UniProtKB/Swiss-Prot annotation:
Pfam families: Bravo_FIGEY, fn3, ig, Ig_3. It is found in: Membrane. It comes from Acropora millepora (Staghorn coral). GO terms for cellular component: membrane. Residues 1118-1144, 1206-1280 are annotated as: Disordered. Its main location: membrane. Keywords: Disulfide bond, Membrane, Repeat, Signal, Transmembrane, Transmembrane helix. Residues 1262-1273 have a biased composition (Basic and acidic residues). Disulfide bonds join 58-111, 268-321, 369-417, 460-511, 553-604. This is Fibronectin type III domain-containing protein.
């Protein structure tokens, strides 16, 4: 009973709180807080009251008034501090700011925000702040140090007050600006200021005396303090001349701790005479600045090693400082080791908890605080700003997880996870929203598309919280559908139909869904379509390289749906091109000129598009003869947790050619990744290979190809289990990093965004640095998202050189920095054009050009662009006046280049050339155009060559070459047998056919024999490239069944029948035509036999004007010439003679459009319209006048427009008559073509003609009237 009451209570409460449980009051959320600690020296200065040194934003949102509280080192900052101390302020948006700071103000700062009405609160992470400060020396008393010449001197910088971010120097007592010089013999410890001189010389004593002693000076934040002065007292003794290196006490201990992401300095000092050379090594390998975040500043003579950003994976190891000089003994240099232990401030191991978590009422959920840190962090959970100290029946704290059980509305709120160790703290904030929603189908239900004889799935997915506990399905008759008898109702409510039947399953379905808050029912219609089926799939093939394969795929689908096809090779979609084509009308995928890379598994996918999606697949294996079979049984030795594994395999058949090597390919789960070769195993007997430094944070699969002299095998099946790697730092910077100058004063820095598999971890972004070269400015740093590929440099200036650098960073750490790249910003294009362009040596495929170089004072000339275009000299008639869009271009670099040979031209072609100077701003003005005709050359192979193979004949047909390279003068064709495996070595004797021939029958061949067919075309330069093809003649047999004949009416009582032979049998010697009227009971009549060698068609006359049926029969000398066997008759073609009056006086029907009366009627109508139009034009314009000024303006505008059109569109001319008359024809001059060199006076005399009435009617007529030359010439075309 109490369970029912509880359910009723919850139901009532849920109704009051609205189905979505959208809160009326938004809880407070911090929206702006610093992501980085303020710990860099000089970032926060002490005692500076001019500016606000500490500014910590803590903006937050919420429905009610908010209250901000800040804590410093876990103690609340008293609000009175903001009232009485003018150097501390708490702004209305929660920002804390301060100035005039002291060293005591360093530490952690944390922001708390509270809703003043609901008392719900939230908080930020603890932000670490270091105050750059200088402590004064405790004593300023001078002091003296006694030392012998040749012995080392070590002097401590005297005690002083607390300091941070300071630098040390030893300066003159007379003037602080005069420093005691640092050298390879003199060092100052950067962390303590202690002075170390390897050995004292007379020069040192003299320097001390000149400076009147030296003082330890400490400085930071524009503050300086100096200690008392040090003077030297020299003790008499014998000077030590030479010594080998030995290490003094160091401020760095043998075991050092560092924090990931922060700076770490290691310092070593050695004494020797002469001064030693210091080298830093990591695990025995010498370190260099700029690699793996290592910097060895030259100012410290190699004593200081700085790691600018510590990485656990790179730097948790042993570093060695080695010292050596010419006194180093045979045992090697002196060494000092530093073992670096890297600790880590808390960070999210994968990602922080979501900012919003929706949990259906009465359901379970969880929040995970997945953190990585060293040492282990303390994890705490908070609700509405209050720590959850113990679990309840509804919310349980389980280490880094927070578990919600049987959730009620009371569990809604702000939940925060904090993870803290000695190095830092991170905080998450999640609003947990409890949903209570009765089932609703407002987002729709159906329609459903099912396919005959396939599995059908009908989803029932209402909006509901909790998920419905009850689902019921009903058919259109209202009968409930239960699991069984071909139905299954899955847990999520989906109705599964095992095998769809149209008669049973087309119609309406209803789904009923219920939870304890309510129920809902929806009705949808199911339509059943015929499923997609492949009726003829591709077959497995083994073919030779260089041949062609045809893969057929025919499918059927529902007639109301559109059927599509796509092809895949090894699961990658095939891109169609000139070599790989899908012949849609034939349902054939054809691949020409096969290469070994084309081997693979080809899959045809036939489908109907979404939402009515149905697909069918069929696959075939295509092996390229000679290449090995792929390896099998691929195995991985481990799951790749450390980014290393070993791949093993079983070698496949080599196909009679020894395997040379193996190619290992890799692919990840990311959508932008593809199969990529990552290893070349050169040992042909290998059966395993180690894979190291794999891509991080990825699920990887591998496959392998074996390679022999014929090429690579098909790829193996990929590894069955994924290789899942841990996260790592990026190992590269973005590819194609460069500068791209744009218009004047523009510069874009561009790169190729890194593919997801190259990230090595989540959260990738780029750091970009840039500055103007030789400006003295610091590098400007910007941050760019992983998907970005460019950055526009602000205020780039006119033709200024910039330098820039990029780095990829992810949540694990920083990748390597790119080298500095330099580029000039944008400039204007050159203003001059190349002059005196001349043509030099000409060959069939090249033209030499020369010109005078261009100078440009406001930037650079990077080179020249040569534009060229042409057309065959056979058809060339006109010259272009502007560069057409299809022109080719060649870039010639170098401003001083004045001669260049353009290659790759087509023979026997008229080319035009235009040259421009260019730079990053674009092209300069165009040069004058020059022309050249290339010489003839040998032609390419004939085109559209078809080879029809029979038993004793081969028929070859062709068309002229697509690359004639001149005037074709002849063809030749021939054939020759071959028995070896290399038919290219066979010499073919060919017979000339003459230039007009388009077919050649090769006779007297041997059945079932391999032949090489070869043919060539010729120009005056000789025979061109051969077309060669290997074929095998068929067995001796009668002709195959002919194709349907082509029949055309040639007269009112006759037709021409064209014979079309069939393939697969012997060649046709003779053929006859069988014909009859298409009347029931009519018998076929036969023509006499026609010699197929002499003619391929026949005229049949004396026919009636009725429909006839025609078919053909063929024969040859099989099995004997005396008793030949006829072929089967072809299929029937129906046709009739040409309509008209027959010669026997019978009238047949004539189409209306060919009737004489209809043609006469059209002519009469046209004449009437012409007379009417002439009358209208005459009456409108008679006696009209207009002003001379307007007429002249119109004429000038027309001339300008015409000139503009010529310049943009281009026009052609030659020495003959122009294709179109000029816009203002001269009445007293001969026609002439357009000429760009004409003088402006050439247009004089082309004005309007003088009429008999003594006035210039055209010139001064009605201003509405267009002059004759402005009329559209097409206006009368209809009546001509």
């Amino acid at each position: 009973m109490w369970q029912i009451l509880l359910a009723i209570s919850i139901f009532s409460l849920s109704k009051l709180s609205n189905a979505q449980q959208q809160p009326k009051v938004a809880p407070p959320q911090i929206t702006n807080f610093l992501a980085e600690d303020k710990v860099a020296p000089e970032e926060v200065k002490f005692r500076d009251t001019d500016v606000w040194q500490l500014v910590l934003p803590c903006r937050a949102t919420g429905s009610n008034p908010l209250k901000w509280v800040w804590k410093h080192n876990n103690a609340e900052i008293n609000k009175n501090k903001f009232i009485f101390d003018r150097d501390w302020e708490l702004l209305s948006d929660g920002t804390l700011r301060a100035r005039g700071l002291n060293i005591s103000d360093r530490g952690t700062y944390q922001c708390f925000v509270e809703d003043t009405v609901t008392k719900v609160s939230t908080f930020s992470r603890k932000l670490r702040v270091e105050v750059t400060a200088v402590g004064d020396f405790k004593s300023h008393k001078d002091f003296t140090s006694s030392v012998k010449l040749g012995e080392p001197l070590n002097v401590e910088c005297p005690p002083r007050g607390p300091s941070f971010g300071v630098t040390f120097a030893w300066t003159s007592k007379k003037a602080r600006s005069i420093q005691f010089p640092i050298s390879n013999r003199v060092a100052i410890d950067p962390s303590t200021g202690n002075l170390h001189i390897m050995y004292i010389t007379e020069e040192d004593v003299s320097t001390f005396n000149d400076l009147e002693g030296i003082r330890c000076t400490i400085s930071a934040a524009n503050t300086f303090y100096s200690s008392g002065a040090l003077t030297l007292q020299i003790i008499p003794g014998k000077e030590i001349k030479l010594s080998s290196p030995s290490f003094t006490s160091s401020t760095s201990s043998p075991n050092e701790n560092a924090v990931e992401g922060r700076r770490k300095d290691l310092y070593c000092e050695a004494t020797a005479r002469p001064p030693p050379k210091l080298v830093w090594k990591k695990n025995g390998v010498e370190l260099k600045s700029g690699i793996d975040f290592i910097e060895i500043p030259e100012a410290f003579e190699g004593r200081l090693l700085s790691i600018t950003s510590v990485k656990e994976s790179l730097h948790e190891t042993t570093f060695t400082c080695e010292a050596s000089n010419n006194q180093t003994i045979a045992s090697g240099p002196a060494q000092q080791n530093f073992v670096l232990n890297v600790e880590v401030a808390p960070r999210w191991a994968s990602k922080p908890p979501d900012s919003l978590k929706e949990i259906p009422i009465s359901s379970n959920g969880n929040l995970s605080c997945d953190v990585y840190a060293q040492p282990e962090p303390e994890i705490k959970w908070y609700r509405d700003g209050r720590e959850i100290t113990q679990s309840s029946s509804k919310v349980e704290v389980s280490g880094s997880k927070l578990l919600f059980k049987d959730t009620t509305l009371d569990e809604a709120g702000i939940y925060q996870c904090s993870a803290e160790n000695v190095h830092g703290m991170i905080v998450s904030s999640t609003y947990v929203k409890v949903l209570a929603i009765a089932p609703s189908f407002k987002n729709g239900f159906g329609p459903f598309y099912l396919f005959q004889d396939s599995e059908g799935r009908l989803k029932c997915d209402p909006e509901a919280a909790p998920r419905p506990s009850t689902f019921k399905w009903f058919d259109e008759n209202g009968a409930e559908i239960k699991s069984g008898n071909g139905y299954t109702i899955e847990e999520d409510g989906t109705l599964v139909i095992t095998k769809v039947e149209r008669s049973q399953h087309a119609g309406k379905f209803s789904c009923y869904a219920k939870n304890f808050l309510g129920n809902a029912t929806a009705e949808g219609t199911a339509t059943v379509y015929d499923r997609t089926r492949i009726v003829r799939g591709p077959s497995d093939l083994s073919v030779n390289e260089g041949t062609r394969v045809d893969l057929r795929c025919e499918a059927v689908a529902d007639s109301s749906l559109e059927l599509h096809y796509t092809w895949k090779r090894d699961d990658a979609t095939i891109e169609y091109n000139r070599r790989v084509q899908w012949l849609k009308d034939q349902n054939v995928l054809t691949i020409a000129d096969l290469t070994v890379e084309d081997a693979g598994i080809y899959t045809c996918v036939a489908y109907t598009p979404q939402p009515k999606y149905s697909e069918a697949k069929a696959s075939a294996i295509v092996n390229i003869a000679g290449a090995p079979f792929p390896p099998t049984n691929l195995m991985l030795s481990s799951e790749c947790q450390n980014r290393n594994t070993t791949l093993s395999w079983v070698t496949g058949e080599s196909n009679n050619a020894s395997i040379l090597y193996f190619l290992i390919e890799r692919k990840s789960q990311y959508a932008d990744d593809f199969w990529q070769v990552i290893a070349n195993v050169t040992n042909p007997n290998a059966t395993s290979h180690p894979l190291v430094k794999l891509a991080g944070n990825a699920d990887l699969a591998f496959r392998i190809r074996a390679v022999n002299r014929f090429g690579p095998s098909r790829p193996s099946e990929p590894t069955g289990s994924f290789c899942r790697t841990i996260r790592a730092v990026p190992e590269k910077w973005p590819d194609n990093f460069r500068g791209v100058p744009g218009k004047a004063e523009e510069l874009t820095i561009a790169w190729t965004a890194m593919r997801r598999v190259e990230w090595n971890g989540p959260g990738l972004y780029y750091k970009l640095w840039y500055r103007r070269v030789n400006s003295g400015d610091a590098l400007v740093e910007v941050r760019r998202e992983a998907s970005s590929d460019s950055f526009v440099v602000p205020d780039a200036g006119y033709y200024r050189q910039w330098e820039f650098q990029i780095q990829a960073i992810n949540e694990v750490g920083e990748g390597p920095k790119s080298p500095l790249v330099k580029q000039f910003s944008g400039q204007d294009p050159p203003t001059g054009k190349p002059e005196d362009v001349t043509v030099g040596t000409i060959t069939a495929r090249s033209v030499e050009l020369s010109w005078k170089k261009v100078t440009f004072t406001r930037g650079s000339v990077d080179g020249y662009r040569i534009y060229f275009w042409g057309e065959s000299r056979v058809s060339a008639k006109r010259r272009r006046r502007a560069i057409p869009g299809y022109a080719s271009v060649t870039n010639v670099t170098g401003v001083n280049t004045e001669r260049y040979t353009v290659t790759g031209l087509k023979p026997y072609t008229n080319y035009k050339f235009v040259i421009t100077a260019y730079n990053s701003g674009g092209n300069g003005p165009e040069s004058d155009q020059v022309a050249a005709d290339t010489d003839e050359a040998e032609p390419g192979p004939p085109s559209d060559v078809q080879v029809f193979v029979f038993a004793k004949y081969i028929l070859v047909t062709w068309q002229p070459p697509s690359e004639p390279n001149g005037v074709i003068t002849n063809y030749r064709v021939g054939t020759e047998t071959y028995t070896g495996s290399q038919p290219t070595d066979v010499t073919v004797n060919m017979e000339e056919t003459g230039v007009e021939a388009r077919r050649k029958l090769l006779r007297d061949l041997v059945p079932e024999t391999n032949y090489v067919v070869e043919m060539q075309a010729a120009t005056s330069k000789g025979w061109g490239t051969s077309f060669r093809k290997t074929e095998k003649t068929v067995a001796w047999a009668a002709p195959a069944k002919p194709e349907k004949p082509i029949v055309e009416g040639t007269a009112v009582d006759e037709v021409r029948v064209d014979y079309k032979f069939g393939l697969g049998g012997g060649y046709t010697h003779d053929f006859l035509v069988m014909f009859r009227k298409k009347i029931e009971g009519q018998e076929f009549q036969n023509t006499s036999w026609v010699d197929h060698f002499q003619q391929q068609s026949i005229i049949i006359g004396n026919l009636d004007p009725e429909l006839y049926q025609f078919k053909t029969v063929a024969r040859n000398d099989y099995p004997s010439q005396e008793n030949p066997q006829e072929s089967p008759a072809s299929d029937i073609t129906e046709a009739r003679p040409r309509p008209g009056i027959s010669n026997v006086g019978k009238r047949v029907s004539t189409p209306i459009y060919q009737s004489a009366w209809f043609i006469a009627l059209l002519v009469l109508i046209a004449l009437l319209l012409l007379v009417l139009l002439t009358f209208v034009l005459y009456t409108r314009h008679q006696g009209a006048k207009y002003l001379v000024g307007k007429r002249e303006k119109k004429r000038a505008a027309a001339l300008i427009d015409r000139e503009h059109f010529d310049e943009e569109e281009g026009s052609f001319s030659n020495n003959g008559r122009a294709d179109h008359p000029p816009p203002y024809p001269s009445q007293g001059s001969l026609p002439r073509g357009a000429d760009s060199d004409r003088d402006s006076l050439d247009d004089y005399g082309e004005g309007p003609q003088f009429n008999e009435d003594g006035s210039f009617i055209e010139e001064y007529g009605d201003e509405k009237k267009a002059p004759p030359e402005e009329k559209d010439p097409s206006s009368l075309a209809t009546f001509v």
